[in-house]
A protein has these predicted regions:
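Active-site lumenal/periplasmic loops and adjacent helix-entry segments of GT-C-fold
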Residues: 37-115
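Membrane-interface transmembrane helices that cradle and orient dolichyl/undecaprenyl
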Residues: 164-178, 286-295
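Juxtamembrane membrane-water interface segments that cap and precede transmembrane helices
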Residues: 71-75, 85-96, 241-276
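Membrane-interface alpha helices of multi-pass inner-membrane proteins
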Residues: 144-147, 165-170, 177-192, 200, ...
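Membrane-proximal, lumen/periplasm-facing interface regions of secretory-pathway glyco-
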Residues: 345-396, 408-412, 427-431, 444-453, ...
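Transmembrane-helix motifs of polytopic, lipid-linked glycan transferases
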Residues: 108-129
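Membrane-interface helix-loop-helix junctions at transmembrane boundaries of multi-pass membrane enzymes
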Residues: 211-220, 284-306
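Short periplasmic/luminal acceptor-recognition loop of GT-C membrane glycosyltransferases, typified by
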Residues: 395-437, 460, 464-472, 498
Length: 505
């Protein structure tokens, strides 16, 4: 009796499954992953410096627990007492990739997660009944080389894009209650939840303009999810304090601090070159909206405003190239959906012509972007850059001793190879500036070679026993050569290490 019931249940489930949809999704995911793999195999290097940090911290979480102590940046707002992992759930997702070689695991992340994001894009387009949604979804590889370069990184942006598309899909389908748990997850995933709140606010406002009836339920569910994600958090209340410190400097024009390159805007022509097809698809979508005799759909209006929002952010900061091209493609596809559907109904022969035209556009654009992404990966920093210098420090320094690094963005690779020592600053220079502005300015002056006999200051103020620097800090190296408190003890083709002599105390 029980056996017949179980068999009947499985039979019913198999009947309910839309097998063409499932098989198409599996096939598309394999294509997406395969195309991403063609980029990753172009070089053994990782696409960005931050990749080293994320995969290493995930390994530490696997070995020491989901909230391990973080002693490695004691002179920043990420000191051990105040530490907050603002990519907490992302690092949890990385844990399965930390078994075995970490570098290879990081590369698999840069294949699997973007493929999942693009699959979500296809699900979204399929849900909007876009003709040839599968071909449109291949356009994610065509619209922007910079977009691809961002998503192959072992960083949160691919999962963030997936989650934003999923939550917009849920909102457009009217399943508002799902926004609460999804917003909760997103808040644990990434501290960019203001993007989510803005996106849902755009949806609510647009629906109000269309229906003349204000329904705040989507925004309330999303806000509750974000609020609960902040409060029911393993790092509360440190997370709230950190978010204030992290976001505020980016909103202010603080030219005194050189933050990461991704926070600065592109020149207009650079956007045209690296995301020209995304801009073309966006304006083609506008043309489609103007071409229709009937009023635009709610879905098209929402996507237009969201894409415009990310476009404005892109001209403020180049890091938003991880969102604008993807949403531009989705907007263009949804904007053209009614016209294409009508055309295919009136001219059935077009069903054979249209996919051919799409392929003729996609193939060269995809090939161009893949080749560009492969070349960019080959030009990235060698994954072995600080391997030997870090090994030397592990062997010759005491556990927990401080190392004065002369470049904040070297921290990630140093951390990857050497958690034996702790460092001055890393990930973002504002983390030390927010902790102690004067200390940051002193660190910067030393690294620029503006402080004579800096070894004494490095020992007394920063408490460091060693200094590690790349070989491009010429002015610092010139000062170090004549500094009686610094003794060079190691050098290779990438780095030099100095011992801070005990007499500097």
């Amino acid at each position: 009796m029980m056996g017949r019931h179980v068999r009947a249940h499985h039979s019913s489930l198999a009947t309910r499954l839309d097998w063409p949809f499932v098989l198409t999704g599996v096939g598309l995911w394999l294509v997406f992953a395969g195309l991403m793999a063609t980029i990753q195999i172009a070089s053994p290097n990782l696409p960005s410096n931050d990749d080293f940090f994320h995969i290493k911290l995930a390994q530490i979480m696997r070995e020491q627990g989901l909230r391990p102590p973080f002693p490695w940046l004691p002179l920043t707002i990420l000191n051990e007492q105040d530490f907050f992992d603002h990519h907490f759930f992302y690092h949890v997702l990385l844990i399965p990739f930390t078994y075995g070689d970490l570098r290879e695991g990081a590369k698999w992340v840069g294949i699997i997660f973007p493929a999942c994001a693009f699959l979500m894009g296809w699900i979204f387009l399929h849900g909007q009944r876009v003709p040839y949604a599968a071909l449109w979804s291949l356009g994610f590889f065509a619209v922007s080389e910079a977009f691809i370069n961002r998503l192959i990184m072992t960083r949160v942006q691919a999962v963030s894009l997936l989650m934003l598309l999923l939550m917009l899909h849920v909102a457009l389908k009217g399943r508002y209650r799902w926004l609460l748990p999804l917003a909760f997850i997103y808040t644990w995933l990434y501290d960019a939840f203001p993007l989510l709140l803005t996106m849902i606010a755009i949806y609510v406002a647009t629906r109000w303009l269309f229906d003349r009836r204000l329904n705040l339920a989507p925004l309330i569910y999303t806000g509750l999810g974000v609020g609960l994600g902040l409060v029911i958090n393993p790092y509360f209340p440190n997370n709230v304090v950190f978010i204030y410190h992290h976001i505020l400097p980016k909103l202010m024009d603080n030219s005194d601090i050189n933050v990461g390159n991704e926070w600065y805007p592109y020149e207009t022509w650079t956007v045209v070159k690296n995301s020209g097809l995304a801009l073309l698809v966006f304006f083609a979508g506008l043309f489609a909206l103007g071409f229709r005799e009937r009023r635009m759909s709610l879905e098209a209006a929402v996507l237009f405003l969201i894409t415009l929002f990310f476009g404005l952010l892109l001209f403020k900061s180049r890091r938003f190239v991880e969102y604008f091209p993807g949403f531009a493609l989705v907007f263009g596809a949804v904007a053209w959906q009614p016209l294409l559907t009508d055309w295919l109904q009136k001219k059935p022969a077009a069903a054979k012509i249209l996919p051919v035209l799409l392929v003729l556009v996609l193939v060269p654009a995809i090939g161009f972007n893949l080749q560009g992404a492969r070349e960019d990966l080959r030009g990235s920093s060698s994954y072995l850059r600080y391997a030997q210098a870090s090994a030397w420090l592990v062997e010759h320094s005491s556990p927990g001793s401080r190392v004065f690094n002369t470049d904040w963005d070297d921290f990630t690779q140093l951390f990857y190879y050497n958690t034996h020592n702790v460092y001055m600053l890393g990930l973002d220079p504002t983390y030390m500036h927010q902790y102690d502005p004067d200390l940051y300015k002193l660190w910067r002056s030393i690294t620029r070679g503006e402080v004579s006999e800096s070894g004494q200051t490095i020992r007394q103020v920063f408490g460091a026993e060693y200094v590690i620097t790349d070989l491009r800090h010429d002015r610092f190296l010139n000062q170090a050569e004549v500094d009686p408190w610094l003794q060079e003890v190691y050098r290779d083709e990438d780095a030099a290490i100095f011992l801070v002599l005990a007499g500097a105390d």
